[in-house]
């Protein structure tokens, strides 16, 4: 609903003609729109711009650019998590007594999550390299630290290359009756170390680690890999916040000084003719503002990066 009269009086139409005498009826007039809730209905209130329109658009664009960096990172992370859950769900399905084993599906899901994990890291690093080149070396250290600290991360990094060029990642799938629960079977998905070490793949420094270990439980490996990627996701978000926090605070102060509030805004476009005779005939373009800045910090609070304080 638009809070404006659908039919204007002759006096109102005369006022529009006088105000926009320099415009033709086909010219577009832009106004500021604000969405407000009233009795559970979202209304669009249309007003004049409180400041220079171009200044408001510039602020919106800056918020949008920052928001997209966080959002793209979140999308890539969710893709990885989705692949992990698909793999774990398949493993649970295989535990059903009458469910047949399928080595093809197991390896397909495993290869998906190995690829999406690497894709997540590659995307994050490329985004920083493109937008914040001077900070890339510091950012890359986050990935290097995780590689050094987590066997699951560095092993899966190499296992992904192995599965692309040499062979399937999971070499053994065992299923036996669960004598505690007659309706379930016990599933074991193994990455056998002899299978890896006897292949043509160059494991480099990782070879000694593999030799020192028993065969690797694929399910436990995936869970540890997910933890490692989740740690990286948090560290990447911290890094982005350190880059953008001061600018976000300044943008927030500017919007508050302009008298804008924590609501959704847009640019409303109408021809001069429609403004006079059909004011509800509009097109809108979103303007990012305080609510969108808040949304960035809300997500960061959800993943434990910041703590929000209610000032009320």
Task: Tell me the role of every PLM-derived stretch.
Residues 2-107, 138-312:
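Acidic, Ser/Thr/Gly/Pro-rich intrinsically disordered interaction regions
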Residues 105-128, 157, 161-164:
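Short, hydrophobic, well-ordered secondary-structure elements
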Residues 127-139:
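Inter-helical turn/loop segments and adjacent helix faces that build the functional surface
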């Amino acid at each position: 609903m638009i809070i404006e009269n659908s039919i204007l009086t002759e006096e109102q139409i005369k006022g529009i003609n006088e105000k926009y005498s320099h415009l033709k009826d086909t010219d577009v007039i832009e106004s500021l729109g604000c969405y407000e809730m009233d009795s559970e209905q979202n209304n669009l209130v249309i007003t004049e711009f409180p400041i220079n329109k171009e200044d408001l658009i510039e602020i919106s664009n800056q918020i949008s650019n920052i928001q997209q960096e966080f959002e793209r990172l979140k999308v890539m992370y969710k893709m990885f998590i989705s692949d992990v859950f698909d793999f774990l769900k398949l493993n649970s399905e295989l535990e059903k007594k009458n469910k047949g084993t399928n080595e093809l599906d197991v390896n397909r899901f495993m290869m998906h999550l190995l690829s999406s994990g690497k894709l997540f890291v590659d995307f994050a690093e490329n985004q920083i390299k493109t937008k914040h080149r001077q900070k890339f070396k510091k950012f890359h250290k986050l990935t290097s630290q995780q590689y050094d600290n987590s066997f699951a991360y560095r092993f899966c990094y190499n296992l992904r290359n192995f599965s692309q060029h040499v062979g399937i990642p999971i070499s053994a799938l065992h299923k036996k009756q669960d004598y505690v629960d007659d309706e379930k079977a016990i599933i074991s998905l193994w990455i056998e170390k002899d299978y890896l070490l006897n292949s043509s793949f160059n494991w480099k420094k990782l070879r000694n680690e593999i030799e020192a270990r028993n065969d690797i439980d694929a399910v436990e490996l995936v869970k540890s890999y997910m933890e490692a990627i989740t740690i990286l996701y948090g560290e990447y978000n911290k890094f982005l916040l350190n880059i953008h926090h001061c600018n976000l605070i300044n943008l927030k102060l500017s919007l508050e000084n302009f008298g804008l509030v924590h609501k959704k805004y847009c640019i409303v476009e109408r021809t001069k003719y429609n403004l006079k005779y059909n004011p509800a005939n509009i097109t809108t373009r979103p303007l990012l503002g305080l609510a969108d800045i808040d949304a960035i910090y809300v997500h960061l609070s959800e993943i434990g990066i910041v703590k929000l304080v209610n000032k009320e």
